[in-house]
């Protein structure tokens, strides 16, 4: 909305041009989302969110019992309200915003249910949401992607792009959800991912000269999705103020599923599947490897990582005696190293 107001009034009053700046709108989205979440989340979570019932087999699950959970149903609508103000809206962006809310609502219904929903029900819902998002992004046309170590691009037919996109978004949703078991962990790792994606989408993929210099594609809507990424990073900053150890509330499935969904979508919008490792490698290893272990054992009777407990944060807490702050700091340091190292390789070795 603000973008279009700026477009209409910039000739009448020069300072209104500021509202047409994606950089300004990204900063405004970050600050507004962060402030609203920091200011109002505890009040609404205490009043409207259910109490955590603990996770079966999770390490130190008893410490979370009784705290407000499902806080995502509070901060995701705040995030969406800000997006309606700061984004140069398109039908695609509106669709992504709507699906983010859908993911949050279904997660919240599971959070507040007296009996946890079955894995297959939640998996099927995630699959439908992932399919809708992939079709919304790529349509039924061939999609061009770019790969590491080559300046050439690859065309994927919809018969290949749609299944791969669905699998990626579904994995992002569930890996992020599995990581939400340590105070501040999923929020910190995800906020790092969104900041990196925001920088890539705005400064590189959404910038004509920079994308040409680095021999990567230029996307006209890259800066728009950069605003979205920075706004979610701000939202998570406000949430982490209250989720820092020892936490006073938790995002629950209402937050982690919506957050994972948006993370998956933004990686697709970047056009390079390997960015998933760059921005969210620790999230994928921590939560996604456990999904792989369970799937192989359940459907193919193949056992892997027999001596490792998943999610990996439970393994290091129980078997390595890491404290919660140690898990958070060490996982974050590994992700920082992965992001900086792999990003240089991805962008410069072409």
Q: What is each of the regions a protein language model found here?
A:
Residues 231, 286, 306-310:
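Alpha-helix N-cap/helix-start motif at coil-to-helix transitions, marked by capping-box chemistry
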Residues 181-195, 305-313, 317-328:
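Solvent-exposed interhelical
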Residues 39-65, 291-322:
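Cytosolic, membrane-interface loops and tails of multi-pass inner-membrane proteins
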Residues 325-346:
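Final/C-terminal transmembrane alpha-helix of multipass membrane proteins
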Residues 242-246, 259, 267, 271, ...:
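Hydrophobic alpha-helix feature that most strongly marks membrane-spanning transmembrane helices
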Residues 2-285:
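"…together with the soluble PPM/PP2C metallo-phosphatase catalytic core" -> "…together
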């Amino acid at each position: 909305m603000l973008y279009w107001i700026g477009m209409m009034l910039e000739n009448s009053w020069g300072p209104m041009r500021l509202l047409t700046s994606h950089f300004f709108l990204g900063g405004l989205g970050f600050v507004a989302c962060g402030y609203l979440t920091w200011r109002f989340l505890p009040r609404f979570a205490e009043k409207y969110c259910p109490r955590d019932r603990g996770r079966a087999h999770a390490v130190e699950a008893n410490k979370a019992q009784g705290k407000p959970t499902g806080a995502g149903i509070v901060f995701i609508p705040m995030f969406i309200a800000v997006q309606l103000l700061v984004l140069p809206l398109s039908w695609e962006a509106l669709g992504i915003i709507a699906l983010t809310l859908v993911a949050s609502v279904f997660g919240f219904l599971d959070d507040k249910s007296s009996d946890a929903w079955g894995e297959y029900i939640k998996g099927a819902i995630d699959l439908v949401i992932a399919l809708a998002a992939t079709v919304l992004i790529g349509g039924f046309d061939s999609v061009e992607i770019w790969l590491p170590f080559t300046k050439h691009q690859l065309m994927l037919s919809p018969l290949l792009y749609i299944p791969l996109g669905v699998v990626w978004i579904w994995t992002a949703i569930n890996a992020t959800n599995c990581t939400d078991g340590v105070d501040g962990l999923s929020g910190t790792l995800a906020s790092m991912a969104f900041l990196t994606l925001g920088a890539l989408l705005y400064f590189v993929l959404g910038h004509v000269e920079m994308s040409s210099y680095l021999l990567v594609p230029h996307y006209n809507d890259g800066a728009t999705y950069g605003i979205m990424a920075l706004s979610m990073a701000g939202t998570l900053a406000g949430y982490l103020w209250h989720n820092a150890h020892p936490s006073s509330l938790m995002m629950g499935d209402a937050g982690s599923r919506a957050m994972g969904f948006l993370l998956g979508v933004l990686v697709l919008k970047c056009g390079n599947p390997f960015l998933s490792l760059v921005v969210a490698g620790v999230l994928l290893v921590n939560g996604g490897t456990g999904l792989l272990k369970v799937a192989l054992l359940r459907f193919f009777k193949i056992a892997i990582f027999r001596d490792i407990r998943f999610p990996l944060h439970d393994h290091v807490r129980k078997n390595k005696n890491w404290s919660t702050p140690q898990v958070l700091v060490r996982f974050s340091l590994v992700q920082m190293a992965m992001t900086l190292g792999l990003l240089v390789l991805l962008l410069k070795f072409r």
